[in-house]
Amino acid sequence: MWRGMIVLAGLLSAAGTAHANSRYFCSADDKEARFTLESGFESDAGHKLNHFRGALIVKDEAQSTVFGKRVFESQHLTNHWSRDGELLMEVFDGGGDDTDGATLDLVVVAGERGKPTANFSGSYSLTIEGGEKPYAVEGKVSCGTK
């Protein structure tokens, strides 16, 4: 009887682990930009997005008048991938009346497939198009799991 209960407890705990959610956070602060991103995905097939939020400050004076400070929500996360230690996120801000038609695209690529760790690093690229002149920068990003 005890063996049966131990096996049942083991199966239930394994089932709970299989359905746990994945939460990631990434941040960067360099001469070009300062941002934080936080996302949560279901571990089930498809990795459905639970939540996403973030904030960005563009430090370039020419760009800061349009995209100086931005807050991101779930609708801004246009692409994401998280699997086996690798994380990719694309954040797109289509602007609006306050940007005179300019758009912002922030892409984060971090981690290494096959080497999952609690803390990992990578790179980001930030592109602003549609303004007076195109703006594109790259930098390093630090990420982790919660």
Language-model region placement:
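Bacterial N-terminal signal peptides that target proteins for export
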Residues: 1-6
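N-terminal signal peptide c-region/cleavage motif recognized by signal peptidases
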Residues: 14-17
